[in-house]
Amino acid sequence: MLIYVVYSEGFESNAKSLRTAVKNEWSDASVNLMGAYGKTDSFAKYQIQINKDIIYSSESVTDNTTIINLIKERL
């Protein structure tokens, strides 16, 4: 399983925490973190994908448990 976490500058620690949570749940998962930077300081993005399917996308972060549950729903 390949998970992409696309995040803006302020969400890096959240993205790293999610990577750890996903690896704890599925040790064989690959998690790619991709920083995204906008043209303004107010740019915010937190997006989670399984392969090419977006399962969460927002200008704010949600908790890891919610994301893990969204992944489980797609499996």
Where are these regions (language model features)?
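Local sequence-structure signature of Cys/Sec-based thiol-disulfide redox active-site neighborhoods
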Residues: 1-25
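A domain-level signal for the structural core that forms small-molecule/cofactor-binding pockets
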Residues: 1, 23, 27-29, 33, ...
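Thiol-based oxidoreductase modules, predominantly thioredoxin-like and allied folds used
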Residues: 7, 27-41
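Non-catalytic, surface beta->alpha helical segment in thiol-disulfide oxidoreductase systems
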Residues: 53-75
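Hydrophobic aliphatic residue packing
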Residues: 31, 48-50, 71
